[in-house]
Amino acid sequence: RLRAEKKLARTIHFSFGYAEGGGIHKQYTLEDPTNLERDIFKVINYFANRLCDKKALYRTLSVSLTQFIKESNRQLNLFIDEYERKKDVKLAKTIDHLHLKYGKGIVSKATSYTEAGTKHGRLGLMAGHKM
């Protein structure tokens, strides 16, 4: 939705809720605002690996984004590969367009087609239930 609104997010809020109650809450402010899932998941994965109990059972995961800016106001960052970033943004926008035109299941990562992949079995479900 961020890309559709032509916005970038600076702050990522996320929480992991334990099945037995309690959990971990964290927020992280990016130096370079983003609207790419890869950048957001990289931050969450980093903190999940450092903070989460790998033996605990988790019931909830919550992710939210704040501190939005317009894409057109993004400043050039000399410390990242701008060519690579533009390529990633173009790919993400193309995938967004295909999802709008043909539906969510039209483009998937290769891992979705492996035995461990769950995406195709969950298409058409809302919170794990048939709609």
Predicted regions and their residues:
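Basic, low-complexity intrinsically disordered segments
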Residues: 1-131
